[in-house]
Amino acid sequence: MDIKTDNFTEESWSSILQAQSNAKGFHHQYIETEHLLKSLIQENDLAKSIIKKCNGSIDQIKMHLNDFIKNQPKLKERPENLFIGKHLQKTINESDQIKQSFDDDFISIEHLLIALSKDQRCCNKILIHEKIDPEILLKSIAEIRGNQKVTDQNPESKYESLKKYGRDLTSAAREGILDPVIGRDDEIRRTIQILSRRTKNNPVLIGEPGVGKTAIVEGLAQRIINGDVPSALQNRQLIALDMGALIAGAKYRGEFEERLKAVLKEVTSSQGQIVLFIDEIHTVVGAGATGGAMDASNLLKPMLARGELRCIGATTINEHRQHIEKDPALERRFQQVLISEPSIEDTISILRGLKEKYEVHHGVRISDSALVAAAVLSNRYISERYLPDKAIDLIDESASKLKMEITSKPEELDEIDRKIIQLQMEKLSLKRESNLASQEKLNAIDNGLNELKSKQSSLNKQWQEEKESINTLSFLKEEIEKVQLQIEQAKRDYDLNRAAELEYGTLNSLQNKLKQKEDLIMVNNNNDQKSLLLREEVTENDITEVIAKWTSIPLTKLLKSDIEKLLDLEDKLNSKVIGQKQAVQAVADSIQRSRTGLSDPSRPMGSFLLLGPTGVGKTELSKSLAKELFDSEKAMIRIDMSEYMEKHSISRLIGAPPGYVGYESGGQLSEAVRRNPYSVILFDEVEKANSDVLNIMLQILDEGRLTDGKGKNINFKNTIIILTSNVGSESIIEMTNKKNEYELIEEVVRNQLKNYFKPEFLNRLDEQIIFKSLKKEDLKKIVKLQIDKVKARLKDKGLEIELNEKVIDWIADKGYNPIYGARPIKRIIQTKLETKLAKMILKSKSEERSHYQLDIIDDQIVFN
């Protein structure tokens, strides 16, 4: 026959071209069968899988081929023209006859392979050496091809489609690869019920990301292999289809549909033995629909309706609404199973079930308190993700972190190594010196080195011993897990003798060894006075460290109990916010109630309306609160409400609605809280905002949440809401001057508030706190605080100043103004003190002075 491209499939023709390149590469004049076989086992996946199915070794075939090729005559240079050898011509003719006997339209890889197995030049001997003859090849090819015929030039992509584009979950469950599934019995039972229907037997699992949709399918796979399912699902194969792999590389129109049809044909021809699982099932809508081609969902619909294809889908609530609900014909073919987020108690049970898998993988122990902390803290602090996924991630990362510490050099030993290197460098430097002082230093360094090296040796030995103990425990746990898998397999195969031998012999022995080793380590640790270099148990502290990294919450704030942390809050605030004891006490009391769990947990930690004249400490209280509770003044989100005087400006706070410019950017408030959920939010001069803008405050104050422009819930439960206002400030100043009682001032201001704010707004606040006007005594304390800040800045410059009471009284007198509060103090210090100091610093550079005494002479600050 003529060798024409039209007679071959794409892959078989590619192999012949590669054979030509092989012949050229070896400087051979003729293209022969050995070149073709080499190209098949080098480049072609189908040829490799056929040989592997025949239990042949690719490496051995390559070795024998190379030996044969080396002994063939070759030219000195690469030949320009090549000729087809008689054996190759005969093999191609033979493959054409095999094609006709198979009733195929094109010569494909398997035809070439069968023809090569009959080649008398070398291929037959090489394949026979691996116990591969034409009969064995035919049997293996029949298994791979099934009933498919070669009707186009790309048939190889349709062979074993499920193996290529799917993952056998029942096989993975049998091998113990899948994690155990704890709980979720109702959801699995409902899924089995739907799968057992006659028609429309296709469940779709709908739930938020991370609630365990895929885990339910894995749980079903485990039930199938354990026989814990109705007869309709006994011995079925559960295969997860990879839509990404199915679409990837389908460059020609219709290629994707061909692949999908091959998969569906394989599923339907199994007579219900295969159940298909499509994760992210919304991807089938529109998949492959380019240039007018039909999408995947339209190929699935008829088979789903007739019950020929049993398919489990999984998707999120949003994706289901956006993609599947738009296609009612597809939606009605699936029966919905809603998967809700598990409770904290259920999550702890799930974590306890998974604990062993993670212990074996990481080679560490995980304490039960760590599991409880992971569930509770992830639910409290990680608001945008769902249980149990976020809790499992916490355990995984904490265990990974500890494993990394175990394999790395301990910090104590690393410090000693660095000190030794430093002393050795000093020793080399001192050896060049010959004076007596250098010799004494050298002797001291030698003594220090000897001491450090002795300590280094001891710590190294201890580290190796501890590491070895942990590795031994890890190895024993892995062995126990392997034996448990073997026991399960033996029970499934009803090999009860083998199961009993493993369970009461091997497993018992390993468990005893593990217990003895753990007891020995515990005794050694208790007897040993030395502190351990390595930890092998994940504790609650490890969980809090990981959460601190994820959410930027200061670590110490989680490790301390809420009560301990807040006991001295009032004193600390009073030291920074002067003259407002009632206000500070009200704020501290409210936060203490919130943090000790006595107030409503669904509301913000505290919500306060601070009223009073300018400069009395309203904003300062917010900053101080942020610093004390969250370790940084940057944890304060400041929203200036004078910028929100128009009704439409609400979109700047929560984000523009869909279709408007700025929708993707999000809102100033919503995005700030999403990024920093643990912060003090200051709404400054709240009375200046439009009343409609204030309406969004109602749900924040009442329920601790806000829905932004994108429809996402923003959690305000861990924020402190502070609103400041100048309402009633004139009355406060006037009545303070008349020395009225605080209660009377409070009553007057509260009555004025009703003219500015709606009752439903005022009623939702924890406290309405009225700040008094500052007295002269308060101003003196503020002066001292401001002077301390100046001193701290001067200390960096290497300068010191001393002030007597006269200077403090003078600054307080000059800055005293009941209307403006403490703000003039800052200006007085700036103009009268800092300006002169700046000039003195410039002079001191030439005079080399570093200490100044301040005094008041002739109503002026003087430096001595």
Swiss-Prot record:
GO MF term set: ATP binding; ATP hydrolysis activity
Organism: Prochlorococcus marinus (strain SARG / CCMP1375 / SS120)
Biological process, per Gene Ontology: cellular response to heat; protein refolding
Entry's localization field: Cytoplasm
Residues holding ATP 2: 612-619
Region NBD2, annotated ranges: 562-773
CDD domains xrefs: AAA, RecA-like_ClpB_Hsp104-like
InterPro entries in UniProt: AAA+_ATPase, ATPase_AAA_core, Chaperonin_ClpB, Clp_ATPase_C, Clp_N_dom_sf, Clp_R_dom, ClpA/B, ClpA/B_CS1
Assigned GO CC terms: cytoplasm
Location of the region described as C-terminal in the Swiss-Prot/TrEMBL record: 774-864
Taxonomic classification: Bacteria, Bacillati, Cyanobacteriota, Cyanophyceae, Synechococcales
Name recorded for this polypeptide: Chaperone protein ClpB
Keywords: ATP-binding, Chaperone, Coiled coil, Cytoplasm, Nucleotide-binding, Repeat, Stress response
Primary location: cytoplasm
UniProt gene name: clpB
